Amino acid sequence: SGAESDFGDGAAALMIGNENVAVEIEGVYSYTEEFTDRWRRANDQFVKTWEERFVNTQGYNRLLTITVTNALKSVNLKPQDVTKLIYPAHSKTAHTRCTMPAACGFTKAQIQDALFDRIGNTGVAHPLQMLVAALEEAKPGDRILLVSYSDGGVVFNLRVTDKITGLQGNRRGIKKHVATMKDLPNYGRYLLFRGLVSREYEAPAPVPYASLPREWRERNSIMSLHGSKCRKCGEVQFPVERVCPKCLSKDEFDEVSLAQTPAKIYTYNKDFATPTSDPPNSMCQVDFEGGGRIQCIMADRDPNELEIGMPVEMVFRRFHEETNIIHYYWKA
């Protein structure tokens, strides 16, 4: 379907503060109108939509034009004052044919790439991911108009400060995430990952076990990938432990984050027996630069390319589901 080629999976998070900011919010405008075009209930597997012409003419194009026109008036801005215009869309075609930019006086050069060829429509995260992509190329003083759409829209009038140069290239952002993406080998693997098909026979998987009290006690290691660094000898270990395995000092440590630390494969195996949607199941032990080792499952990898000493990065992924609770952990 068209949705399969246009939709994508992704998330975005921004840190909000009032000191030393890279981007200033100089104004916000919102417009709401009761309009149903696309929907999905909690238990629905697929997104549903009304007839496309009605959705685009009476909904998407009309509501975006009203929202952005009013936003420009509210903050006393002209289209030529804006460096980049960011607006999401439910499909690549809808974004390309959107009538709002021309109606409001924007040029094609001002429109931010919607990432459909690289990531796709990730839903709520889509405009924020487009913003991150714009900030990777932004210069101090640039003005960005960030627009979200749903039964109307919200417009953020943003100004880039000189602090942006300290962030560019130091975060994964869009560029680095896209650079490490792996293509699925075939359409069947996609359907399997989505749970849309099942195998003719699959051995029963082990029943996952999770302890919520333990997950809470070790939340810094599980959620934030924190290890401990001994204050006396400098030994780093994972997960956080009270006793140093090298000098045996007790409670003499500082927590250190390993999530962004360069790492390499120490050893690995290929498990063809354990049930998995992406065989073989690849387990590895990873050594972090400066100390620390973790055993974990590998993701986004080609089993034929694995080798000892291969550089890897850590990613936070869905691990398993138990009693209707989704648990997350780190993979390499």
Regions found by a protein language model. Give the residues of each.
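OB-fold/S1-family single-stranded nucleic acid-binding modules
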Residues: 307, 315-332
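Conserved hydrophobic positions within beta-strands
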Residues: 263-265, 298
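Condensing-enzyme catalytic core mediating Claisen C-C bond formation in acyl metabolism
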Residues: 2-58, 62, 66, 146-149, ...
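Conserved catalytic cysteine-centered active-site region
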Residues: 1, 97-130
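Cys/His-rich short segments
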Residues: 204-262
